[in-house]
């Protein structure tokens, strides 16, 4: 396995980000770390969250010799990113809610942000709105339950559409034309969200922008040369290496199947003392 790209999230939401990165770098090796023992992150004290994430990610970077870390979690990006960058010598990429492109796209200038309560209330989020959407009416919707519904869908294949409609009723009532998906879990249920909200609402997430940033940083660090070499090798021998790591005592059969279908050949539990 060559030096992998390490994608990190509290749960399965980061798979949506990983999928976007793979479109740009299809022959790279990947590690996916999901800290599902502590899901959802939005309910943890900040210092507890920081200590646990730094320990997990730094240990796995050392183990895998990862060349870049992608924090595919909005909560962790706003809380943990500075500590990770202080403890790692490799690039660390975070998630930024797609407020700017949403404001640019909106014709009615009525946009919304659907995220966890933690992301909705953070000062950083309000700074983004002030900086990039001051000409828009912006509605904020915080909902942790949608995170668990996305996890449940991956685990069982089932989605309670009646409950989803109830949760999204305030979004429908707001009469928006663009809704930012401010949690990486939400693209995993994008079809269901679109079904409830209707075709008149455009859903935007940050996956493509993150992938573009990863390519830029690898180029700046001269690591894109290594990626081209790996690409040539992969074209000769086949599929890239994919490893998944989780922290819960066990994961569901449905989630295991999903990871295998995504191309992961190794699915392993790791532990942390934090």
UniProtKB/Swiss-Prot annotation:
GO BP terms in the entry: cell wall organization; peptidoglycan biosynthetic process; regulation of cell shape
UniProt name for this protein: Glutamate racemase
Domain of life according to the entry: Bacteria
Pfam families: Asp_Glu_race
GO molecular function: glutamate racemase activity
Reaction catalysed by this enzyme: L-glutamate = D-glutamate
Record EC number: 5.1.1.3
Record flagged with keyword Endoplasmic reticulum: no
Keyword Cell wall biogenesis/degradation applies: yes
Binding site for substrate: 9-10, 41-42, 74-75, 184-185
InterPro entries cross-referenced by the UniProt entry: Asp/Glu/hydantoin_racemase (IPR015942), Asp/Glu_race (IPR001920), Asp/Glu_racemase_AS_1 (IPR018187), Asp/Glu_racemase_AS_2 (IPR033134), Glu_race (IPR004391)
Stated family: Belongs to the aspartate/glutamate racemases family.
Keyword set, alphabetical order: Cell shape, Cell wall biogenesis/degradation, Isomerase, Peptidoglycan synthesis
Gene3D superfamilies, A to Z: 3.40.50.1860
Native organism: Shewanella baltica (strain OS185)
Function: Provides the (R)-glutamate required for cell wall biosynthesis.
């Amino acid at each position: 396995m060559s030096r992998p790209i390490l994608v990190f999230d509290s749960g399965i939401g980061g798979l949506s980000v990983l999928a976007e990165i793979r479109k740009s770098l299809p022959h790279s090796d990947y590690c996916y770390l999901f800290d599902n023992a502590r899901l959802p992150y939005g309910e943890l004290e900040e210092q507890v969250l920081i200590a646990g994430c730094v320990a997990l990610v730094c240990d796995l970077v050392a183990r895998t010799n990862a060349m870049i870390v992608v924090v595919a979690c909005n909560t962790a990006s706003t809380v943990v990113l500075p500590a990770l960058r202080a403890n790692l010598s490799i690039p660390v990429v975070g998630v930024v809610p797609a407020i700017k492109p949403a404001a640019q796209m909106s014709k009615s200038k009525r946009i919304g942000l659907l995220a966890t309560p933690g992301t909705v209330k953070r000062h950083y989020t309000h700074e983004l709105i002030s900086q990039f959407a001051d000409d828009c009416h912006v509605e904020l919707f915080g909902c942790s339950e949608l995170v668990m519904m996305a996890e449940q869908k991956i685990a069982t294949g089932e989605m309670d559409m009646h409950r989803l409609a109830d949760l999204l009723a305030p979004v429908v009532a707001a009469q928006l034309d663009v809704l930012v998906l401010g949690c990486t879990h939400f693209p995993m249920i994008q079809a269901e969200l679109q079904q409830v909200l209707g075709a008149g609402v455009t859903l935007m997430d940050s996956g493509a922008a993150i992938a573009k940033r990863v390519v830029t940083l690898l180029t700046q660090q001269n690591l894109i040369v290594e990626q081209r070499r790996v690409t040539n090798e992969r074209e000769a021998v086949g599929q890239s290496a994919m490893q998944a790591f989780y922290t819960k005592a066990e994961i569901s059969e449905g989630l295991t199947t999903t990871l295998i279908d995504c191309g992961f050949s190794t699915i392993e539990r790791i532990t942390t003392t934090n």
